[in-house]
Amino acid sequence: MAVRAVRGAVQLERDEAGHMEEQVGALLTAVLERNGLHTDDLISIWFTATPDLRSDFPAAAARKLGIVDVPLICAQELDVEGAMPRVVRLLAHIESDKPRADVAHVYLGAAATLRKDIAQ
C-alpha cells in the first residue's frame, strides 16, 4: 500500500453548524465512495475553513460520520481578498494501491471552480 493524498472542498450556503455538518459529511462521503475507501484506509485529515465560517469545526462532521480513530485537525484558510467565501477544504492522507493519477479529488457544487484541473 502506498500513501496518497486526496483533496476536496465544498462551499456552504450559510454559516450554521447543522448545515456545515451536512455539507462536510457529504464531502467526506463522496471522497470515500469515489475512491473506493473505507474509514480504515484513512491516515489523517486536515480541514481548513475560510475565516467567515465560525459555527463549528469541520472535523465534528467527520466524528459524527463515525470517523473516530483517525487524527483530524482544523485550521483557518488564508484570508485572501476576493477568495470564494464559506469554503471548507480537506486534505486526506490515505492508504491505497491506486496510482496517484487515479485518485479522485472531490470538489462539490460551486467549489468545483476552485480546482478545475483536478476536480472530478
Predicted segments, located by residue:
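Terminal domain-initiation and capping elements
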Residues: M1-Q120
